[in-house]
Amino acid sequence: MAEYKIANGKKVLDRARELEKLETLGNLTNDSFNRHGIQELFQQIMAMSRKLQYQLLAEEGVSGNLPFTRIDHIDRKHCRVVYQGVEGAYAHEATLQYFGKDANAFHVPTWRDCMEAIKEGVADYAVLPIENSSAGEVNDIYDLLEEYDNYIVGEQILKINHALLGLPGTSLDEIRTVYSHPQALMQCSVYLDKHSDWQRISLSNTAMAAKKVAEDKDRSQVAIGSPAAAGYHGLEVLEMPINHNRFNSTRFIIVTNRKMYEADAKKVGICFELPHTSGSLYNILSHIIYNDLNMCKIESRDGHGNIVQTETTVTE
């Protein structure tokens, strides 16, 4: 079949012809259960045939080259990296862990600014938080990945141990207000519930919260952040760790606008839109089975055209 289509310039998929054949096969029985079973069986046979045809066309060079370039390794030394927040932020720590302590990195106020920096060529890579083991996904990052033509090329898992940061000499009795990122406040909610008289105020970044406490020089204010943030802003670690999940970690993704992947990559993230019809997701997931991949996560998102985001890893 593939040889015929190569020779005659035919497309692999002829949807109308497949539907016609399935209708003919379904009409061989009057039983609705058997009809459905026969059609599903031959749908799978046709799908397997198409996958093999696409593979053969690729081997013959008919279907074109893969749009992503394979590279040996990301050059982590000769590049500019952007992250959201200020020095001492968890994103800053993740940046230094992935790109090295001498990384040529700079910070911007928002995650969107990170994406814009890549788009405009000001930065080669951005380091963005995408999920936390306690608080879940960072939905705004998924929205930005959908909006911008940027691609995930790596990840950094950062163990998160939140600390209560205050001016040197601050006692717990003096505290009236605690500042931090909403997720950090959530991850420390059990600890904060023991201090119900403390007002919780959200800021855009844990390190920015530390910076505010340092600049205001008010002992009634504290921040939740990293010990590194305390060091950068001259604060004292009053208590640590205060997050209730002692295995708390955040996954940061390394994003670029270049279509490339490392030779030893074993994870792929895919975002796609499906019609709201029976079997549409089922048919897409068949590609994961066919290519011997193990799906470790799937997420359905509402409000953006029924977007489904999946992540798969190659089976060992």
Regions flagged by a language model, labelled:
Residues 1-316:
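Domain-level signature for soluble enzymes in the chorismate/prephenate branch of the shikimate pathway
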